[in-house]
From Swiss-Prot:
Source organism, top-level taxon: Bacteria
Name of protein: 5-oxoprolinase subunit A
Protein transport as UniProt keyword: no
Family the UniProt entry places it in: Belongs to the LamB/PxpA family.
Organism in which the protein naturally occurs: Vibrio campbellii (strain ATCC BAA-1116)
Amino acid sequence: MTLNNQQLTLNCDMGESFGAWKMGADECVMPFVDMANIACGFHASDPNVMHDTITLANQHDVEIGAHPGYPDLQGFGRRSIKMTNDEITNMVIYQVGALQALCKAQYTDIGYIKPHGALYNDMMQSDGVFLAVVKAVALFKVPLMILASKENEKYLEIADDFDVPLLFEAFADRLYQDDGMLTPRTQPNAVLNSEHAILEQVRMLAESGRVKTASGQYILLEADTICVHGDNNESIALVQKIRQSLYTGGN
């Protein structure tokens, strides 16, 4: 059955290998997701990986999203880098433009933009960084994917000034705080490791738009899409179960 009268989609970070270094199992997880967030070369990926991931997404009719991050290969883009807002705007334009060019070489295009790691977190914590990202996204005339939270309306108002649609996402495997933000990875239990806990969080999001927070409270999250990860055999199997639960109600 379709839950909540509006089917939640599944998105996944992909194309994060580069050179001889292998990251993730894109070939295995791509058939089970709706949207592929493809790294653009700064936190991970390279032109060949980007090309191959675009090809793979096209083969499975998966929507392509640009996944720009800070220039931090060693830290996988999870370290915040101090930049001016103009520098952030230009950095995002540069990365998205590279992926868009590789898409056009295969007669396709990007469908949305989702920042990565520390840039994503900074965007959700600083209106200035959010505005800098929105200005970049506006040039590509696609939606921006951000974290669903209690402040959805605030972000909608800012983005609307630049005619940028927003896609709100929730995370299948992350523990939430009472304010709707993700528990920092530096804190214990920030990532849900139990298959039961992850499937239960997805079920609640689909049926009632709620999640249980670290303190035990239940909060509303108005999300359009759920982020999943497919880094190993166990996580790929879990993505399959998540997809089944969304499309069949777990039956």
